[in-house]
Every structure is written in structure tokens, then in C-alpha cells.
């Protein structure tokens, strides 16, 4: 995914965050028609750029849930 595609997808993710305060990787993947790996990379790139914040919810055992917020 080049920089232009990342910026376009980032704008769509920001519009998704207007309606929902929290997003999961699967939400972004289904909305943008990406596989989960590309959606995860896009969201991590957005975290590194400072657009969004990442929160990790730990469950019993080794289960983690990544939640992305504004």
C-alpha cells in the first residue's frame, strides 16, 4: 500500500471513528475490503503517525484485544 492509499484509507477510518468511538481490526478490514493483516498494518501506521490511539485489553490466558480510538 503506497502513501496515497494509506492516506485515503486513513481518512475513511477517521470517518468511521466519528460514528463509533472504538474500532477493531476486523471492523476496518470489512469496511475497507482489506484482509486483516493489511488493516492491522494500516492501523499501526496511523498509531505511529499520531492519528489514533491503541488500547490493549488483556483477557485470562494469552488472549489480547486491540481497540483503536481517537
Residue locations for each model-derived region?
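Short alpha-helical segments that sit at the start of domains
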Residues: 1-14, 60-62
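Short, low-complexity interaction segments enriched in Ser/Thr/Pro/Gly
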Residues: 3, 33-35, 51, 67
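Alpha-helix N-cap/helix-initiation sites
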Residues: 6-7, 21, 36
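Residues within the helices of the helix-turn-helix
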Residues: 15, 26, 44
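Short acidic, hydrophobic short linear motifs in intrinsically disordered regions
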Residues: 19-31
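Short amphipathic alpha-helical interaction segments
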Residues: 34-45
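A short, conserved structural fragment
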Residues: 47-57
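Minor-groove-contacting beta-hairpin "wing" of winged helix-turn-helix DNA-binding domains
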Residues: 58-70
Amino acid at each position: 500500500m503506497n502513501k496515497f492509499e494509506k492516506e485515503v484509507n486513513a481518512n475513511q477510518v477517521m470517518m468511521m471513528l466519528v460514528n463509533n468511538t472504538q474500532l477493531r481490526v476486523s471492523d476496518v478490514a470489512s469496511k475497507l475490503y482489506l484482509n486483516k493483516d493489511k488493516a492491522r498494518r494500516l492501523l499501526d501506521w496511523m498509531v505511529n503517525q499520531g492519528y489514533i490511539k491503541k488500547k490493549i485489553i488483556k483477557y485470562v490466558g494469552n488472549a489480547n484485544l486491540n481497540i483503536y480510538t481517537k
